[in-house]
């Protein structure tokens, strides 16, 4: 099998994530595809990245309504799977009273939920470039149906724990696959705003699901929490199957490329086997792995040869409906059933944990999930008793304040961040850097820790209700702004390996959330609520402050990880 990859990756000046997003006086000075064709821009002169082809089957060329419909479905799936993952708490009291299932057991179920959310991602990710995006969504929604039915039928401790494994598996698609699909249909300069809606959908599912689930449990029975989850997941599965088109697209087919004489999967495998030997050889030549990859024309001769390609894309016909909604869309590079390719990808994808941007995004986003565990636990501990005396619905309504804060935070790190990036790029000779998105988090650096102190210390010391609700809004602001920035920063840094990067973030994020789920109650009991939240606020401040070294050395980190990035792009042919 011959493999293809665009030539830009082998340019010695290439740095992952660094892009020219504004036209210069000489447009020919920039052409990501080396095609010689005019660079495509929007009306404001922003260069469209990735460059769209002329094919009617290119998702970047879809009409506005077609994109919005697809975006709506993806956002609904995101909110739904987040809601199903956060509705079990509404049934805890009933399960404890009727069947004697302990709260600790249900806490264990929450830990299992987080583990399956994070680690399911890496099992689904390799299938994305081999079999298409749709199959993962369908499997995850089916898992959501099964998990919800199992939870609705719960009678034993094992039911409440292992039903959450399937529920967690269902949310895995929203942790990485959705971001990949969004990057398939939207341009890079739009991703901040697009991710605003994604984080909002996650926020609505996470913060309003407990309220809705409590209302269902009170008006019907606790079992209907599970039944309604299964019904909505099933209905969404049907809509998705018939209404959500495949977005995977072989972009290299429409642009001049370089062709390798050997299989890329084999190429990556051999690179792994001989990595140590290669390092020694490069050291003898005076090169180091942390230097930019340099490939001279002589070195590429015989290994890479230009392919002559006359674009016939504009003459292509739109694929028939049945092909656009096919259960599986095999990659043009698929070998047989792709089992060996799947296993190679599964192993190689762990390389993303060597990328600093993955760790920064994963830690920032993961800690926000951890804080949610703490404030939900504190709500259950304090606000049913004197002097608050809230009902279950009253406690659930408290999260509306958190949602309002999340909306504001998402707007700042999404819509305003996109404008901020364009403004900074203009001041930087049209060149955009992913680190531009981090500047707005200096606002969050102050607001988010303040929110933890206002809520946690306020609950313990019985501060006025206004302080409690403002604290929750500030926590929500941190959730929304950090979530949006973490996603967009990583997607900007390594735009051709979105799903691999998001898998790394999801594993870090949900593993952290799992750990904090188990230690939360013990920490609050051992240190006291006020002291615990003060420590959390310090952790929050320090973790967000990691953006400072990223602003200084982020580009250097991306340059040093160029080889790893290229190997991952080669592995998937740039198809995610």
What are these model-derived regions, one by one?
Residues 67-86, 165-166, 354-372, 473-474:
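Pair of pore-lining "gating" transmembrane helices in MFS-fold secondary transporters
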Residues 1-63, 247-345, 422-428, 561-576:
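Intrinsically disordered, low-complexity terminal tails of fungal membrane proteins
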Residues 103-104, 188-198, 392, 496-505:
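Loop-to-transmembrane helix entry/capping segments in MFS-fold secondary transporters
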Residues 82, 86, 94, 111-114, ...:
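C-terminal transmembrane bundle
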Residues 165-201:
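Cytoplasmic helix-loop-helix junction between adjacent transmembrane helices
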Residues 52, 66-103, 124, 174, ...:
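Extracytoplasmic
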Residues 233-256, 547-551:
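C-terminal membrane-cytosol helix-exit motif in multi-pass small-molecule transporters
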Residues 190-218, 227-236, 240, 402-410, ...:
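Glycine-rich segments within core transmembrane alpha-helices of 12-TM secondary carriers
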